[in-house]
Amino acid sequence: MALNKRCVILSPDLTDMLNRDKNPNGAVGAYTYNISIWRFVPTSTLRRVLALMVLCAMVLCAFGRDGDQSYSFLNITSSSKIYGLGGMNISLVDDDIMTTDQNPALLGQEMSGQLALNYMRYIGGSNFAGLRYGQKVGAHGTWGAAIQYNGYGSMKETDESGNISGTFSAQDVSFSGQYSYDITDRLRGGINIKFLYSAYAGYTAMALATDLGINYYNDEKDLSLSFVAANLGGQIKKFDNSYDRLPIDLRLGWSQTFGSLPIRFSVTAWNLTKWHMPYYESGDGTDTGDFKRKDSFGSNLFRHLVFGADLVSSPNWYLGIGYNYKTRTDMSTYSRSFVSGFSIAGGIRVKAFGVGIAFAQPHTGATTLMLNLSCNLRDLL
């Protein structure tokens, strides 16, 4: 199967209802269906899906204003390919189980049997690692499971006067379960439920978060459109006397190739629960200049967008580049580098095994590197 194609299997029980032709290659049980599966999907089902998405949008817009104050690690992808495409992409249709952490509707039966590991050396000596697996269920469903560990290293503990009294560690752990379903041959919905455990210097907290996603993929035009309502939920055990909000968010995504050009372009819009996202910029690009508040229409618009492009000429390797304007401008009050906001990714696949790597440098003192290793157990067994 091609690397960026979706596999949809229709139930044999429908064969008497369909106008079908035998596969030219004579494969047993393989048919070309000449009608759309849309006719078998009740209109009421599609209406419920759309109504649910609208309801989520209303709730998020009402409560999402300050939702990015805690649990920001939920916005860090575990996919090296997506990290290299700007760090956010909900519409990338690929045969890669790691991409599903961005949108549960990207999980499909073509990923059945995939096992993947990720490791990332992050800012400030932090180390992130995780494991993800997917398995098909029936003719239209797929489930997935994942665990992600984010360790932030050892930090100094001080008293009110600033005297060092010792050290402490901090970490976040996420356990997640996913399910996706092919509603039609082009439309897929998915849900991701995450249990979050945090431990900071002897204090612990727990939370539940849910992602709802939907993806439309047109194979003929290689067009992918997605919508995600991310991080719905809240804390079930707080650190102290106050509850911390999850970074609930609405996201839209577009990915497409054009003609014979072997490049896929992607644009992802996120932080859609709020418009104004001002930042402060130092006039000389260092942390010692005069700071100016930036809150123009253009600035706010581009701080909501992530751009990416990847080469898709072969299913056995890829190269990608991304640009995140928000990452670059967030570093405006620090010593950002020329490449701040840019990221690159590359990967190869040999038979059942795959390797992916991504690199980014948000500012001069922070070089980040992410590694993915994957294996398809079906091809091995």
Feature-to-residue mapping (PLM):
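Hydrophobic h-region of N-terminal signal peptides that target proteins for export
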Residues: L55-F63
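Repetitive helical segments and hydrophobic/amphipathic motifs
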Residues: L14, Y31-T32, C56-A57
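Extreme N-terminal basic, low-complexity initiation segments
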Residues: A2-I9
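Subset of outer-membrane beta-barrel
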Residues: F63-L381
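Enrichment for repetitive, rod-forming helical segments
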Residues: P12-D13, V54-L55, M88
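Bacterial N-terminal signal peptides that target proteins for export
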Residues: R6, R20-L50
